[in-house]
């Protein structure tokens, strides 16, 4: 986190780093690149293909994004960590591009938004579909429980590292992929996003101040399990990857 707090200072050092001169360290176990991000801000319904498969109307590209939050200290786990499945949760998978903020700000101009990005990572926005509807809610309008749906422990595998922003030519031209036990479930391009990365950053910063170390998850493409009523089980191996950013391999285990 200290590097991100001093991102402007470290950027030229990292840009001039000669990767060929670095020594490869064997037998290292990777943990989440940001164990305790300040905020995990998530965009929902942000891919045309995903909206279509969920049976909703076509998203309005001129509309405002929908955001929700994940608790940063208990949901983020590493690229090889096990994830405990809550009971009766019908947990679903969602490969997502994660944007890591390096320069904070409020009311960020969309045209300068990418200047605030430190880098990008791979994320899996695991979702407890079975816990989303609440028939026991105290009042009918509160019958959809985003807290149980998105905030359970370990619901945000992240990593394997943070690829600096200058190494990614275009965040809207990346291929995302997710497999369960070797079977491809999701494969799409970030070009299918409804609201682009710069617009997401600008919109989020109008609501709250973005800080170094904040993570913005940018939505998931088509291929989730919900429309097919197919969910994760204990023992399943979920591989989440984005070309140029790396891959996560997370085993699902019983609660």
Map each language-model feature to its residues.
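N-terminal non-catalytic cap/leader segment that marks the start of a structured domain
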Residues: 1-61, 65, 177, 237-241
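Catalytic-pocket segment enriched in acidic/His residues
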Residues: 23-29, 33, 50, 84, ...
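Structural motif
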Residues: 39-41, 65-67, 74-75, 96-98, ...
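Short, charged/polar surface micro-motifs in flexible loops or helix N-caps
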Residues: 47-48, 73-74, 104
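Short helix/loop capping segments that flank catalytic or ligand/cofactor-binding pockets
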Residues: 50-52, 77-78, 108-110, 130-132
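Structural signature of FAD isoalloxazine-binding scaffolds in flavoprotein oxidoreductases
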Residues: 59-78, 93, 234-243
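Short, structured patches in soluble enzyme cores that scaffold and shape functional sites
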Residues: 70-72, 80, 87, 93-103, ...
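N-terminal accessory regions of nucleic-acid-interacting proteins
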Residues: 106-121
